[in-house]
Amino acid sequence: MKVAIVHNSEEKSKQVTKQLTTLLEQNQIQIDNRQPELVISVGGDGTLLSAFHRFNHLLNEVSFLGVHTGHLGFYTDWRDYELKELVESLCIHREKSTSYPLLDVRIRFRDGKPDKHFLALNESTIKRGNRTMVGDVFIKDELFERFRGDGLSISTPTGSTAYNKSIGGAVLHPSINAFQLTEIASLNNRVFRTLGSPIVIAHTEWLEIKLQESDDYFVTVDQLDIYQENIASVCYRIADERIHFASYRHMHFWHRVKDAFIGED
């Protein structure tokens, strides 16, 4: 097995990475940061997002696994004190993997530039600096509403527990092959009206946000900020690609949710 390790800049994560590398080498597991079969992130969820974007060109060939050293690790199955057990599992057990949906993001421009294409594991947002964003929301090429407010968030099921949850979106089980549109501080009064509720969109449907002409929009894809001029619209759908997580031990999704947000009684 060939393994790549991605860690954050925290000293604890660097120490854990050093220990993990030693254990892997002692067990004849090859470190390969170019063509790995397994990518191990050491840190928190942000580190795993970084690992995903670093290796998302190899999604059909790699699985991901997280070692938790931070304050919140929704994607991380292993703790930093379980390294020996983790390496033993890599050596003994045949890997099983669980796959989750990803978000296909396509930015279209007014000036004829080629579309820009991205994959998101958690979410993508559209905002407009310090001014009110105005955008027409199309579902399957039909106008659904005209949105006015701070912005829009479009999230995957696994991303539903991240930024989406903090702005009032629903938590979706990752087995649901769909994505979610959640408003960010929408304007709703007698003149301007939106649905005002999160919308769950099936994988067979697609979403396009057509923006009023302006040069101060910015789009995020997970932790990446993408500032672009002349954006005409942003299109979203469930991607053909999926992310695979190595599953050497099972943790029920709702147990993860409880552990991350509620804790023990």
From Swiss-Prot:
GO molecular function terms listed in the Swiss-Prot or TrEMBL record: ATP binding; metal ion binding; NAD binding; NAD+ kinase activity
Entry's Gene Ontology cellular component terms: cytoplasm
Active site: 45
Catalytic activity: NAD(+) + ATP = ADP + NADP(+) + H(+)
Highest taxon listed in the record's lineage: Bacteria
Keywords: ATP-binding, Cytoplasm, Kinase, NAD, NADP, Nucleotide-binding, Transferase
Required co-factors: a divalent metal cation
Signal sequence annotation: none
Key word Lyase present: no
Described function: Involved in the regulation of the intracellular balance of NAD and NADP, and is a key enzyme in the biosynthesis of NADP. Catalyzes specifically the phosphorylation on 2'-hydroxyl of the adenosine moiety of NAD to yield NADP.
Record-stated family: Belongs to the NAD kinase family.
Protein name listed in UniProt: NAD kinase
Gene name in the database record: nadK
